[in-house]
Swiss-Prot record:
Lineage, broadest ranks: Bacteria, Bacillati, Mycoplasmatota, Mycoplasmoidales, Mycoplasmoidaceae
Family statement: Belongs to the urease gamma subunit family.
Keywords: Cytoplasm, Hydrolase
PANTHER family named among the record's database cross-references: UREASE
Protein name from the UniProt record: Urease subunit gamma
Gene Ontology MF annotations: nickel cation binding; urease activity
UniProt catalytic activity: urea + 2 H2O + H(+) = hydrogencarbonate + 2 NH4(+)
GO cellular component: cytoplasm
Signal peptide: none
Originating organism: Ureaplasma parvum serovar 3 (strain ATCC 700970)
Keyword Hydrolase applies: yes
Amino acid sequence: MNLSLREVQKLLITVAADVARRRLARGLKLNYSEAVALITDHVMEGARDGKLVADLMQSAREVLRVDQVMEGVDTMVSIIQVEVTFPDGTKLVSVHDPIYK
């Protein structure tokens, strides 16, 4: 299988997000990398589904609550920016304060 660098990065994010989902299901709090991967995956999948940028910017802020992440992670993640492909082209989605307080 010949994957481009971008495809490898997307695959790694998806795997990390899957690990994060399983840890949340076990009641564990997520670290920085897991939290970012989960929110990034939400944006990537939403774009693939054809959702609007504005809708993704809002819904991504509802993926995680502060009680689901380790102490201090919410302050470390002030913005997540994801470049994703929508049906009408590639766009940068910026999610400010992505962890719901």
